């Protein structure tokens, strides 16, 4: 058995083995536990997608509600239907997303690059915070926020569909141009 360097062996000294009245009863408990795990796994399998690496993701242009230049790939669910979804948005350096909000909470994790996000009614680069690779942010439903990039950036967005975006200033909506 290997013990991770991050866990001190002394921490394991307090763990006592489970006492069993017989090897047969222990075997029965293990088999029962395995059956529970397998049946739960089978139920979840229909909802799971195959694991994939970044190179296997299919990218395409973001919907017209996003400024030109962004690409998107949907990893799970359908953002435009009721239910959970996960997508990734790839933006070039200098990309700007004017102040907007969503009817549901938006959760964003930075996969790569530098993603700047701020709260307010107008994009103001002095009011934002920079999130770097691994950074996380969330915008509650209907909270006005804006974003921009300083390098090519990929963010993962997850939330509850249907996804919608409403620009604070309707003239900022690229789908109306």
Region locations from a protein language model:
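Short beta-strand His + acidic residue motifs that chelate non-heme Fe in jelly-roll/DSBH
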Residues: 97-99, 117-118, 139, 144-150
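Cleavable N-terminal signal peptides
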Residues: 32-33, 43
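Short acidic-glycine-tyrosine-enriched beta hairpin
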Residues: 121-142
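A short, N-terminal "cap"/entry segment at the start of jelly-roll beta-barrel domains
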Residues: 44-85, 128, 170-177
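Double-stranded beta-helix
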Residues: 50-52, 126-127, 146-177
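N-terminal secretory signal peptides that target proteins for export/translocation
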Residues: 1-26
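Glycine- and acidic-residue-biased ligand/ion/polar-headgroup-sensing regions
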Residues: 92-95, 102-122
């Amino acid at each position: 058995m290997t013990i991770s360097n991050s866990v001190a062996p002394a921490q394991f000294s307090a763990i006592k083995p489970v006492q069993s009245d017989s090897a047969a009863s222990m075997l029965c408990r293990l088999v029962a536990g395995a059956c529970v795990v397998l049946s739960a796994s089978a139920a979840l399998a229909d909802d799971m997608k195959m694991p994939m690496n970044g190179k296997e993701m299919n990218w395409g242009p973001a919907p017209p509600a996003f400024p030109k230049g962004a690409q998107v790939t949907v990893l799970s669910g359908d953002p435009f239907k009721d239910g959970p979804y996960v997508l990734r948005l790839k933006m070039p350096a200098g990309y700007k997303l004017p102040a907007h909000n969503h009817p549901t909470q938006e959760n964003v994790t930075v996969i790569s690059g530098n993603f700047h996000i701020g709260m307010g009614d107008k994009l103001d680069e002095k009011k934002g915070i920079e999130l770097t690779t691994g950074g996380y942010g969330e915008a509650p439903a209907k909270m006005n926020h804006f974003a921009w990039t300083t390098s090519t950036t990929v963010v993962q967005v997850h939330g509850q569909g249907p996804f919608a975006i409403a620009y604070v200033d309707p003239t900022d909506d690229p789908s109306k141009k």
